């Protein structure tokens, strides 16, 4: 019998939320560490993005392997699984790297706040298992819909913060000239 409704693998939404928050704060902390890094900035960004992506995929795989009520193995077809996992890895990496670059190069705080929110949501959503779609469905939907939507949201937030900062800066300059 198919399970039509997903259930929380950790049995408590609070535990899932705290797990998501912890991982999100570690991810945001990685941006701060990269900011203080004296090594090659590009290499640090690639390592940080890869670590973030590996962590997100580890949560997804770990929850499915440890907490799936009715074993639903990953699809045996590597031509289906590998592209989805590969694109998910790329999306998770790009999310972290984009937030880090916007924060480090332009000083945009909205990028780090966005990273915390998106990471929290990703981990929280990954703790829900057992729906009819199977183990790969959640990751597939992330690749096709949620991931690109979150990157679009980041672009809007970053653009909005830049506009507000420029406007405030122009207002300050005008006030100083009128004195």
Question: Where is each model-derived feature located?
Answer:
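Acidic, polar-rich N-terminal leader regions of halophilic archaeal proteins
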Residues: 1-179
């Amino acid at each position: 019998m198919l399970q039509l409704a997903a259930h929380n693998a950790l049995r408590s939404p609070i535990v899932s939320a705290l797990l998501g928050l912890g991982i999100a704060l570690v991810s945001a902390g990685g941006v701060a560490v990269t900011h203080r890094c004296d090594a090659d900035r590009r290499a640090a960004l690639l390592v940080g993005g890869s670590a973030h992506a590996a962590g997100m995929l580890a949560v997804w795989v770990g929850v499915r392997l440890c907490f799936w009520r009715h074993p639903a193995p990953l699809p045996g077809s590597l031509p289906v699984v590998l592209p989805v996992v590969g694109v998910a890895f790329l999306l998770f990496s790009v999310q972290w790297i984009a937030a880090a670059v916007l924060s480090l190069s332009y000083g945009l705080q909205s990028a780090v706040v966005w990273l915390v929110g998106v990471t929290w949501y990703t981990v929280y959503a990954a703790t829900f298992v057992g729906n009819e779609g199977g183990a790969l469905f959640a990751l597939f939907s992330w690749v096709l819909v949620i991931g690109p939507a979150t990157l679009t949201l980041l672009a809007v937030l970053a653009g909005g913060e830049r506009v507000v900062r420029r406007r405030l800066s122009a207002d300050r300059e005008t006030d100083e000239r009128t004195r």
